[in-house]
Amino acid sequence: MDTSSVTMHTERACCHQAQRAVAAMLDKAPSWLIWTAVLYVGLPFMLYWAVPYLFYHNKTKSRRIAIYVLGDLGHSPRICYHARSFSAAGWEVELCGYLEEQPPKDLLDDPRVTIRALPGASNAGKSLGQTARKVVLQTCHIVRQLWELRGCDYILIQNPPSIPLLPIVAIFKVLTRTRLILDWHNFAYTVLQLRVGRFLHPLVLVSYAVEFLFSRMADYHITVTAAMKDYLVQSFLLPARRIAVMYDRPGEQFRPLPAGERGAALAEPFIRGYIPAGFDVQRGDTILVTSTSFTLDEDINVLFGALKIYESAAAKFDTTLPRILLFVTGKGPLKGKYMEEVRNYKWERCTIHFLWLSAEDYPRLLQLCDFGVSLHTSTSGLDLPMKVLDMFGSGLPAFVMDYPAIGELVQDRVNGLRFTTRRELEQCLIFAIKDEHTRKVLKENALLESKNRWHQSWASAMSELQVVRQS
């Protein structure tokens, strides 16, 4: 055997002997000593690498917020306004939601705003199994996306919908010490209650429990009305100091049309083809607009019924009543049904068009109209229709369906008119069209409303909650 072989054999023997000695020592050592050694070696690793990787992997020097909506970003104006305002305040913004329509161009071009699309949400169908499958898929997508977003200082979510987003984000908030802002537009359980017809339905009770329990884990709350804040304090037992009222206000894209430009605007390609022959706004013909989601809490038949009464009045009692052009914007589950009803009616004085507009064209349409109509009634009675704010931003007086909280936004015969039935809406139309003084007062006050802007409302609420301080 040569010298090198002897040396290798000796080294192996020494190694095995050392291993046996260490094994014997560990076998006789007390367990606390072993765990002390493990902690001594492992704790620095956990603190300096593993924990930051798990919870703060994407931490940035500037403040960072993830803004979530389980809806289409292109048609979620309040969420987009939040993104603009946080970006303007110097924050990094992660804007998360579905991309059915393109979001506003300024957000796409903003270097501080990163848009993160959730995989498309197909219709769940009516069966419980299909709904459960959709919730499971949404949960997987949200969890995966939140993993990528760990390190955010804040998460802001829109409610409703609350399932599955609210429980997931509430748990994530605890694990990562992210602060959670809950932006209340309405209550998910009241929306579901409208569909099933009663509060004591298992699904409604589950939805109520989710909102009641997990809302307590939020650090801050924003509501769209003072009535909603009172409800959260009295019924959900949330502390008033953590709740700020942030009224919806129109974005900067909603502006009144400068005087003298209406004729040229009506000739623009996006709208020109919808103007009927002989329709003359100079002669008093009137353009109305309504935006709807074609759901049960907005009975658009009230508007169509009012126009039918208007047609009858024009034929039987007052042939001088002007023509009406109505634009119906939006989409939803009952749209096809209403379109068929309109097609099957013989209209004489009224023309109705159903539109689905881009985020850029919708403000341009509002500028061309004389009055806006809102049929929103609110499943809770506590929220306000965003569409009316857009109308006010464009200088349009609004005819609104009356319900408890609407008085926080629309003062009857000041900046709009309120109604409860189709007959009352028809009377509002004739009153506003025929009475020059009323029309003038409504227009002047709507123009005053157009000066109330989103950023002032946002800055005031964020300062009250001490999230963003006013400079």
From Swiss-Prot:
Location in the cell: Endoplasmic reticulum membrane
Domain of life: Eukaryota
This protein's name: Chitobiosyldiphosphodolichol beta-mannosyltransferase
Protein encoded by which gene: ALG1
A Pfam family the protein falls into: Glycos_transf_1
Presence of the UniProt keyword Transmembrane in the record: yes
Record topological domains on the Cytoplasmic side: 53-126, 148-471
GO cellular component, one term: endoplasmic reticulum
Matching Gene3D superfamilies: Glycogen Phosphorylase B
Entry-linked PANTHER family: BETA1,4 MANNOSYLTRANSFERASE (PTHR13036), CHITOBIOSYLDIPHOSPHODOLICHOL BETA-MANNOSYLTRANSFERASE (PTHR13036:SF0)
Purpose: Participates in the formation of the lipid-linked precursor oligosaccharide for N-glycosylation. Involved in assembling the dolichol-pyrophosphate-GlcNAc(2)-Man(5) intermediate on the cytoplasmic surface of the ER.
Lineage: Eukaryota, Fungi, Dikarya, Ascomycota, Saccharomycotina
Intramembrane segments: 127-147
Family according to the record: Belongs to the glycosyltransferase group 1 family.
Membrane-related topology note: Single-pass membrane protein
GO terms classed as biological process: dolichol-linked oligosaccharide biosynthetic process; protein glycosylation
Membrane-spanning intervals of the chain: 32-52
UniProt-listed Enzyme Commission number(s): 2.4.1.142
GO terms, molecular function: chitobiosyldiphosphodolichol beta-mannosyltransferase activity; mannosyltransferase activity
Keyword match Phosphoprotein: no
Major subcellular location class: endoplasmic reticulum
Pathway(s): Protein modification; protein glycosylation
Keywords per UniProt: Endoplasmic reticulum, Glycosyltransferase, Membrane, Signal-anchor, Transferase, Transmembrane, Transmembrane helix
Record's catalysed reaction(s): an N,N'-diacetylchitobiosyl-diphospho-di-trans,poly-cis-dolichol + GDP-alpha-D-mannose = a beta-D-Man-(1->4)-beta-D-GlcNAc-(1->4)-alpha-D-GlcNAc-diphospho-di-trans,poly-cis-dolichol + GDP + H(+)
Lumenal side: 1-31
